[in-house]
């Protein structure tokens, strides 16, 4: 993702700039036997964040049609804060591609670590649940969305 905040030595980014689409605390109910968060729960959180961005752009109902890629970068533990940043990267006639990154933070520390990332495809649907046209992706709309953050 662009606009990342970096450490003072300009090495690894700390997290994307702006406000996350979703911020949650990892809870015990969503863990595996090792005390780490289930991959399925993490993927669901990415899908929710991407869906919020897609629905906001389409101004319509949206459905997930593909999880084009998902990469696990670091484990998420119980009690970690997970911040999900999502952005629109491509728009078709009825579809949208959304890039999402999930960054974990131990609740009593400042450092953030990229835990998961993915690319999702959504389709906008009308009242009859048929694909409907979405607005084009243009600079004016993208700039106004960034100003909202």
Swiss-Prot record:
The protein's name: Uncharacterized acyl-CoA thioester hydrolase ZMO0511
This protein's UniProt keywords: Hydrolase
Query: Domain HotDog ACOT-type spans what residues?
Result: 16-128
Top EC class of this enzyme: hydrolase
InterPro entries (UniProt xref): Cytosol_ACT (IPR040170), HOTDOG_ACOT (IPR033120), HotDog_dom_sf (IPR029069), Thioestr_dom (IPR006683)
Question: What organism is this sequence from?
Answer: Zymomonas mobilis subsp. mobilis (strain ATCC 31821 / ZM4 / CP4)
The EC number(s) attached to this protein equal 3.1.2.-
What Pfam families does the annotation carry? 4HBT
- Can you provide one Gene Ontology molecular function annotated for this UniProt record? long-chain fatty acyl-CoA hydrolase activity
**Which Gene Ontology CC terms are recorded?**
cytosol
What GO biological process terms does the UniProt entry carry, in alphabetical order?
Answer: acyl-CoA metabolic process; fatty acid catabolic process
Organism's domain of life?
Answer: Bacteria
What does the sequence similarity comment in the record state about its family? Answer: Belongs to the acyl coenzyme A hydrolase family.
